[in-house]
């Protein structure tokens, strides 16, 4: 039965799809958790993210451009972190309004466990769409969601392992 006072979690979204995976990150659990709360790192990892800022309410606001099949949409939305059971378990959720293209929600439940000096990061990513994007069909949306979540966590792993560095926030200088 449903508990009436329970707040809606991403697992209760309708028409959603789930995909899970796990990666091993060569860093301590605290470092991994801290990094997943770091705006610069999140911005670098979120595919198509053009802007990510923390507003006065402590919520993260994002501007993201995504191509889903033939539709290229610009989303404005917010990203929320649920840290109730951190650092072992927490969730990231984002929802964005793409105007005429419709809306998209995406999120991941993340579970961290220590493995020697490394951290195993398991995630269950979820996505839901509405409006024009939803009419593109479940298969396309599922494959796009899978691709995007994989991009996010692959990039995260590369940043954490030092394979990739964070983009500088200064305006890029022209390379001669």
Language-model region placement:
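Intrinsic-disorder/low-complexity, polar/charged segments enriched in Ser/Thr/Lys/Arg/Asp/Glu/Gln
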Residues: 18-24, 59-61, 74-76, 89, ...
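Beta-strand/loop substructures that line and gate deep hydrophobic ligand-binding cavities in soluble
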Residues: 13, 96-143
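Hydrophobic/aromatic beta-strand elements that line small-molecule binding cavities or substrate pockets
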Residues: 21, 50, 76-83, 106-114
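Glycine-rich portal/gate segments that line the openings of hydrophobic small-molecule binding cavities
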Residues: 54-95
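Short beta-strands and strand-coil junctions in structured, solvent-facing domains, enriched
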Residues: 42, 69, 98-101, 129-130, ...
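A conserved amphipathic terminal alpha-helix motif
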Residues: 132-174
């Amino acid at each position: 039965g449903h508990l009436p006072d329970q707040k809606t979690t991403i697992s209760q979204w309708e028409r959603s799809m789930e995909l899970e995976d796990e990666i091993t990150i060569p860093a301590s659990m605290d470092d991994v958790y801290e990094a997943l709360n770091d705006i610069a790192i999140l911005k670098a990892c979120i595919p198509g993210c053009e802007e990510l800022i923390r507003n006065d309410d402590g919520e993260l606001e994002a501007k993201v451009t995504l191509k889903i099949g033939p539709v290229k949409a610009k989303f404005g939305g917010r990203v929320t972190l649920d840290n109730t059971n951190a650092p072992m378990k927490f969730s990231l959720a984002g929802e964005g309004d793409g105007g005429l293209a419709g809306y998209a929600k995406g999120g991941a439940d993340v579970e961290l466990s220590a493995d020697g000096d490394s951290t195993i990061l398991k995630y269950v990513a979820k996505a839901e769409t509405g409006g024009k994007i939803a009419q593109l069909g479940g298969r396309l949306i599922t494959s796009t969601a899978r691709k995007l979540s994989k991009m996010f966590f692959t990039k995260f792993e590369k940043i954490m392992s030092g394979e990739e560095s964070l983009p500088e926030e200064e305006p890029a200088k022209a390379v001669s």
